[in-house]
């Protein structure tokens, strides 16, 4: 159907009590409405002037009766169209047969057009927005290309580095090319990568000439590389990415915070020697494991040991601005205290290991109240948490989040879970992962 300037479509159903053909229906429509209204609404004149369109008839003959569906397009206004529709219902004969006509619907074709326009405009706009390049994306793309161009190569090993490594008085040693790119995004250009756990000779020589900061991932791989650097290079400061994160996956704010919190090697080992001790000798005399442990964020603390005169204050590493003078002890005394503490820790952890083993792979929690062990699902535990004032111990076969710590920090001194994923830990609370308990 060619709608043209059509505003409305009149849908009509006709039933004739005998056999009729299509031309009989068309003839009845024009013949029985002729002269019924004024000349302005005569169907023949309206069709000649184009104010109504071509009348379509869909006819079926079934069991001696004829059924027709008639559509009549109209570009008249709504009043004239309504009059015209009502006129069609006055038809009572088609050829020799009696007939009844009923208007089923008058459709405003402009509503359909508006709906089509709305849907099509939405589709076009969505396509435009998908194809449009955001200004921020353009800026970042240009910056990224410049940063990539800024990456240079250092030494015979062609190690990726920032443009200022050669001329800067200080350098930052990282693990790989992606870490160099990440620090370039933060505006740090004096970075060089070791590209693996085997430290190249050019890095060893460079660290002897410049103030060097080792900045490694906060995972097991980062620990291994840090140990290698401490053994082979002249490291002045040590910084670690947040626990469980890689340098390349760390935000600019976190990177700057980690670098500001870097720990001098002298401070790490200063608690195990007097002021006249040579730093390089101390580094060589202390295992890399001890140094790595001292700069790794304390995501758990060991259980309390019997009260003894402290060899040194554990908070020296944690707080850069507060340095407590160590109490001078002989080497023999230090070894004795450590041995005593280790035996006490083993005794206290033996019961904890049994509890951890009992809930592994169950999804349950176990807690100790007044010396009595209780096991629940986590949902049941949360339902009854208001009834529990104090617990001696809490373990859960699930990761420990910050929400769990905030809920339980004033109810128990020890929390054990599959993993520890917290950003803030109260001073009086100890957090352990399953791996740390079993190890």
From Swiss-Prot:
One of its GO terms (cellular component) is DNA-directed RNA polymerase complex. InterPro entries: DnaG_primase, Primase_DnaG_arc, TOPRIM_DnaG/twinkle, TOPRIM_dom. Keywords: DNA replication, DNA-directed RNA polymerase, Magnesium, Metal-binding, Nucleotidyltransferase, Primosome, Transcription, Transferase. The keyword Transferase applies. Disulfide bonds: none annotated. Its cofactor is Mg(2+). It catalyses: ssDNA + n NTP = ssDNA/pppN(pN)n-1 hybrid + (n-1) diphosphate. GO terms for biological process: DNA replication, synthesis of primer. Its EC number is 2.7.7.101. It comes from the Archaea. Residues 169-243 form the Toprim domain. The keyword Hydrolase does not apply. Binds two Mg(2+) per subunit. Mg(2+) 2 binds at residues 217, 219. Mg(2+) 1 binds at residues 175, 217. GO terms for molecular function: DNA-directed RNA polymerase activity; metal ion binding; poly(A) binding. Belongs to the archaeal DnaG primase family. Forms a ternary complex with MCM helicase and DNA. RNA polymerase that catalyzes the synthesis of short RNA molecules used as primers for DNA polymerase during DNA replication. This is DNA primase DnaG. It comes from Methanococcus maripaludis (strain C7 / ATCC BAA-1331). The gene is dnaG.
């Amino acid at each position: 159907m060619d709608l043209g300037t059509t505003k409305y479509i009149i849908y009509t159903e006709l039933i004739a009590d005998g056999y009729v053909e299509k031309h009989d229906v068309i003839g009845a429509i024009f013949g029985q409405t002729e002269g019924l209204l004024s000349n302005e609404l005569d169907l023949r004149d309206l069709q000649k002037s184009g104010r109504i369109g071509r009348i379509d008839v869909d006819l079926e003959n079934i069991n001696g009766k004829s059924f027709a569906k008639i559509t009549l397009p109209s570009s008249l206004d709504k009043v004239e169209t309504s009059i015209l529709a009502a006129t069609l219902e006055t038809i009572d004969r088609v050829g020799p047969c009696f007939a009844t006509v009923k208007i089923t619907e008058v459709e405003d074709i402009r509503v359909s057009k508006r709906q089509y326009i709305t849907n099509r405009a939405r589709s076009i706009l969505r396509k435009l927005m998908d194809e449009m390049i955001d200004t921020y994306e353009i800026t970042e793309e240009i910056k990224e290309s410049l940063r990539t161009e800024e990456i240079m190569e250092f030494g015979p090993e062609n190690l990726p580095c920032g443009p200022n490594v050669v001329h800067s008085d200080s350098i930052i040693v990282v693990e790989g090319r992606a870490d160099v790119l990440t620090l370039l995004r933060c505006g740090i250009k004096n970075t060089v990568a070791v590209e693996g756990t085997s430290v190249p000779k050019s890095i060893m020589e460079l660290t002897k000439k410049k103030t060097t900061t080792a900045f490694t991932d906060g995972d097991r791989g980062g620990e291994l590389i840090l140990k290698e650097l401490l053994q082979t290079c002249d490291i002045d400061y040590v910084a670690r990415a947040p626990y469980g994160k890689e340098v390349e996956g760390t935000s600019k704010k976190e990177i700057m915070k980690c670098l500001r919190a870097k720990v001098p090697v002298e401070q790490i080992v200063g608690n195990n020697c007097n002021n006249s001790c040579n730093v390089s000798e101390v580094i060589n005399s202390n295992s890399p494991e001890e140094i790595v442990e001292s700069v790794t964020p304390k995501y758990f603390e060991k259980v309390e040991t019997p009260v003894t005169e402290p060899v040194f204050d554990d908070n020296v590493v944690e707080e850069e601005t507060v340095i407590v003078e160590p109490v001078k002890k002989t080497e023999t005394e230090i070894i004795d205290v450590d041995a005593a503490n280790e035996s006490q820790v083993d005794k206290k952890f033996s019961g904890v290991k049994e509890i951890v083993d009992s809930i592994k792979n169950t999804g349950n929690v176990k807690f100790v109240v007044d010396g009595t062990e209780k096991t629940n699902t986590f949902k049941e535990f949360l339902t009854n948490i208001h009834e529990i004032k104090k617990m001696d111990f809490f373990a859960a076969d699930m990761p420990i989040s910050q929400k769990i710590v905030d809920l339980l920090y004033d109810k128990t001194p020890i929390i054990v879970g599959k993993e520890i994923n917290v950003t803030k830990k109260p001073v009086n609370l100890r957090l352990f992962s399953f791996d740390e308990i079993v190890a």
